UniProtKB/Swiss-Prot annotation:
Protein species of origin: Haemophilus influenzae (strain PittGG)
Protein name, per record: RNA pyrophosphohydrolase
Record SUPFAM superfamilies: Nudix
Domain Nudix hydrolase: 6-149
Record GO terms (molecular function): mRNA 5'-diphosphatase activity
Family to which the UniProt record says this protein belongs: Belongs to the Nudix hydrolase family. RppH subfamily.
Length: 196
């Protein structure tokens, strides 16, 4: 489904833990990282799409998370010309996204990136709250900056839940079902990576 302006309606998902860190996911077979996201199907609300994508991409059920906040506005980004599919009709020039802030309330062992035959991600880790803004691919950076600024006002001021504002990233790195070897994937490796 693409709107009249050429944007595909989409949901973005930020999952935080009780330390205020956020789940950062590694795209399959790539050294690029991003938040979970996905398109909204016909006759599907943004919230329904979010829970579907949450299960498909992260393996979590509604009972595993608490919905803390939904972005007030749709946020848009344009795809770079090299990613446009000029032969598709109608042509999609970018995404318009409604963002959801969730808190993980179940055990993180329930996170499983391998729930579908064609998974989007093959690994994940917890990172400090602002880390994704600096690391995501450049054409998504403005959207990430806006959504994280909006979510920060909820997590760190208005929300009664207590979060640490530490900018220190968790040093544990996870695959879909097992921990990444720290000898193979060093902290330097992760900090140099870029999301897509």
């Amino acid at each position: 489904m693409i709107d009249f302006d050429g944007y595909r309606p989409n949901v973005g998902i930020v999952i935080c833990n009780r330390k205020g860190q956020v789940l950062w996911a590694k795209r399959c077979g790539q050294n690029s990282w991003q938040f979970p996201q996905g398109g909204i199907n016909d006759n599907e609300s943004a919230e329904q799409a979010m829970y579907r994508e949450l299960h498909e991409e992260v393996g979590l059920q509604p009972k595993d998370v608490r919905l803390l906040y939904v972005s007030k506005h749709w946020l848009r980004y344009k795809l770079p010309k090299r990613l446009l599919r000029y032969d598709s009709k109608p042509m999609c020039i970018g995404q318009k996204q409604r963002w959801f802030l969730l808190q993980l309330v179940s055990d993180e062992k329930n996170i499983n990136m391998q729930t579908t035959k064609s998974p989007e991600f093959d690994g994940w880790r917890w990172v400090s709250f602002w880390y994704p803004v600096r690391q995501v691919v450049s054409f998504k950076r403005d959207v990430y900056r806006k959504v994280m600024k909006e979510f920060a006002s909820i997590l760190f001021t208005d929300n009664p839940l207590i979060f640490s504002t530490s900018r220190e990233a968790n040093s544990q790195h996870y695959s879909a079902n097992k921990k990444y070897s720290q000898t193979k994937y060093t902290k330097r490796h992760f900090y140099k990576s870029r999301g897509q």
